Amino acid sequence: MQDPIFAFSIAAVIIFIAFIADQFFKKSGIPSFILLIFAGIVLGPITNLISRNVLLPLLGTVAELTLMMVLFYGGMDINLHKLLANSGRVFIQVVLYVIPSTMLIAAFANYVLGWGWPQALIFGSIVGGETTAAVMVPLSRGLKFKEATRVFLVLESAMNSVFSVILFLTFIGFYQTGTASSYTAISSIVSNFSIGIVIGLTLSLIWVSVLAYVKQYKYTYVLTLGFLLATYVIADVFGGSALLSVLVFGVLLANHKFVETFLRRKLHIDTLKRRLFEFQGELSFLLEAFIFVFLGLIVSISLNNIFFGLLIGGMITLILLIVRGLAVSVSTFKSTISKDKKTLMLLCAQGLTPATLAVLAIGYGIPLANTFIGLVTYVIIFTNTITAVGSFFAAKHLSAA
């Protein structure tokens, strides 16, 4: 067990690094998460100041909490009309990116690496097309994209994680039983999305109405977080996408004028909404800082197979880039965000979902699961580096425009 003073010292250093990295991002366009991941690698794999094995059991919970808070914050900054206008294109993007990427990476693992199809499909679903909300939400805000592009990135990051998880669980079932059903996977995705959205809409409508009566009380923000956690749990219990439900919750809270129209009365919560947004921004920043350092801490880099890992990780990343390029070209065709197409192709950072699924694969006793973690590490590093390069050039382009 780590000494509390040591833990507090590390936490203080992480917060200082996160603040400096954020200011550096605003000046240079180089994302802060790169520096934070590197800080984690130094604290973990390089110096062994913090044990990776201590942190692995916490990954799922910490990742879920971070994604929940980041998506809620992202939803609070989305215009409802823009969301409805772009949701169809985002769905096309996710389908054309996640499914082909998963299958091509699985084929690569089977034919090139010689893995069996069950393991290859499981691995493909782990790295096949996630774009992590922990990167996309703050990055889309920091780069000052037009709103339609920002909505596209945030919504894509929420939806592709759901696709990845469902495909992963489908292929786990294939490994355990020897059978898999495409119908089951498709119906699970439709059901997951629908239930999550309906629960998010219903509970957020209720809560926005309640806020009109409790807005003058102290600790309203904490109470809102409690209801957000309840929304997440309820959506999950009923088989819906908990992440989509909290995203919808944030969107409805931000667009409370829609609720006023629905209820046919004024709620007068504009001041409260601004205060909630500011508090949520601070909390999201803190969680993002720790989760990126966390990712650096748990990466698995072995000097014995580093060249193999770099080669295979690079080839997988190349597959992702090619498929993403084609998917973005189709999904943005003749749209208002087509001008940002080249940047969208490069914003492919992976993080929380593949890292969590790779750890879950170990828990399921999947052969090669330890190899999964190593390769996932390289894919995370490569995709985040490409995203850093893409955001750097995007920042230069947007500042010049």
List each model region and its residues.
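Transmembrane helical cores of multi-pass secondary ion antiporters/exchangers
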Residues: M1-A401
